[in-house]
């Protein structure tokens, strides 16, 4: 066997014997590297005659190509074997149950606000917002609330240090200031709802220092009590999803509406369990009335031309009634177990076409 044939056999045997990719790389360097055996033989051609150098060069180039092809073929085999070993070691049992996915839940307050907006949007209302810190004028005076009214007392209202001009400031006790700001800034007709946070100095099972309200305001020409009743009736039946839900209006008093009425819905309390529907008993859910002429005048509107109605309710209260939540304070305790129980599926926005809650 010639030296070239012996070299060919040795190099190919080393390639085929490589058990893994690092060993194959060592075989490649030993054959084709700068100090490899083929490279060394090419360096020895300087002592040959031109004819011999040409013949030996062709032989070594052919050997170089053959070894390179053998290396690539062996590399492909080794990669497949390595992949097969990895797949065997990392095998997944597809019959095992999947890992539980952590999924957030929509808070009942957020869900209830979305439901309210969906209902009133279908009646042409838009959403209006205002600041939580209000002036005495927007929170009390413009709403025809006299200075001696109990709502202005320190034990009911959170007062803040006066503004730079000395004007009294409070944490708003209702979202009615949004109605005042809207009437001052926009021209009638007006049809808005104003959901948001409100603040009162109270804390027990049915009261918290901060809670949410939504109020509605409609201003236009020839608006009357019939429009108010029809709007509330449609809302109550859509929200509680009871088509024949009875709704009752009881005369009441609010400084900012005249006439004023408390709104009750039908219910049952048999066996200590509250059920919404036509069951012979009544439950109050909101206050309402025709906007007081003095309030219209305070906002620069002529009561002889413009009339309107307004109503408002506590968002937590109607959420508790609809979803059977017994304690108002739990809305704000950040208990994930409570939220998992009473929360709602994310991205499932309520609408009247598919149903408010699913």
Swiss-Prot record:
| Reaction it catalyzes | tRNA(Phe) + L-phenylalanine + ATP = L-phenylalanyl-tRNA(Phe) + AMP + diphosphate + H(+)
Question: How is the quaternary structure described?
Answer: Tetramer of two alpha and two beta subunits.
Q: Which InterPro entries match?
A: aa-tRNA-synth_II (IPR006195), aa-tRNA-synth_II/BPL/LPL (IPR045864), Phe-tRNA-synth_IIc_asu (IPR004529), Phe-tRNA_ligase_II_N (IPR004188), Phe_tRNA_ligase_alpha1_bac (IPR022911), Phenylalanyl-tRNA_Synthase (IPR002319), tRNA-bd_arm (IPR010978)
How is the cofactor bound here?
Binds 2 magnesium ions per tetramer.
- Gene Ontology process terms (BP): phenylalanyl-tRNA aminoacylation
Return the protein name: Phenylalanine--tRNA ligase alpha subunit
Query: What's the family?
Result: Belongs to the class-II aminoacyl-tRNA synthetase family. Phe-tRNA synthetase alpha subunit type 1 subfamily.
**What cofactors does the UniProt entry give for this protein?**
Mg(2+)
For this protein, the record's Gene3D superfamilies field holds: Bira Bifunctional Protein, Domain 2
Where is this protein chiefly located? cytoplasm
- GO molecular function annotation: ATP binding; magnesium ion binding; phenylalanine-tRNA ligase activity; tRNA binding
The record's annotation in Pfam families points to: Phe_tRNA-synt_N (PF02912), tRNA-synt_2d (PF01409)
Keywords for this protein: Aminoacyl-tRNA synthetase, ATP-binding, Cytoplasm, Ligase, Magnesium, Metal-binding, Nucleotide-binding, Protein biosynthesis
Location of this chain's protein in the cell: Cytoplasm
Would you name any one GO CC term?
Answer: cytoplasm
What PANTHER family does the record tag this protein with?
Answer: PHENYLALANINE--TRNA LIGASE, MITOCHONDRIAL, PHENYLALANYL-TRNA SYNTHETASE
Taxon lineage: Bacteria, Pseudomonadati, Pseudomonadota, Alphaproteobacteria, Rhodospirillales
NCBIfam families named in the record: pheS (TIGR00468)
- The Enzyme Commission number assigned here is 6.1.1.20
